[in-house]
Amino acid sequence: MFVRFGLILFCSVLPLVLSGQEPPRVKPTESIPAEIPAPEVSVKQIGEHQYRLGEIEFDSKTRELRFPVTVNMREGGPIEYLLVHENGKVHESILTTVVSPLHLQIAMKLLRYKAGHGDVFNRFLRPEAIEKEGGKETERGETVAFTFQADDKETLPIYELVIDGESAETMTPGGWIYTGSTVEGGSFMAEAEGSIIAIYLDHLAMFNMTREGADIDERWGARHTVIPEIGTKGVITIRLAEKEVTKKP
């Protein structure tokens, strides 16, 4: 089982793991995926359908992934990320992790998650350019949901950690897709920049919001009433969510 899932499938998806999606806070342009040497990784089977890659545990049946995170910010804003690597843009993120974004990308591909930005970055285009240069909603990556659990406390949908500055209310449910980052100059950019779950649209991040306001960098803040103390350890779970049709901004 390990050989079939951990090696054969890994070899089949590795070229996809390292292929880019597109570029950022302006409409991305087309790029040719860079050729990158395969990283040395070790996928270990720890259960009937459960595997471990570094600090990431994932389930080939449910397609869920879990890995450790740390509370980095609990009040104030603006914030541009829900999660970054501990060497990433920590001054703009609620959570940090020691997990390698490249390992996370590999795990996502082993679980056959589809990546793509679709029409998410169209809002950075002039209206007259959307038909020619814009992406389509059908080209989006798969819709995902995140939950956060600190120590042995209640598990929360991750959007509950965020406050919408426009309404002064908790962020509403839903709104993230797997965009998959990109490769530039031979580097997997989520690994280079440490950007994992973006709130403010970022083509270098692995996950981006589809909701209205994702292109406004000062709209979102940390919700201190539910976020535990800075330094608190926790776990993020990623799972497939129901695909939603997002109202165009």
Give the residues covered by each predicted segment.
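Bacterial N-terminal signal peptides
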Residues: 6-17
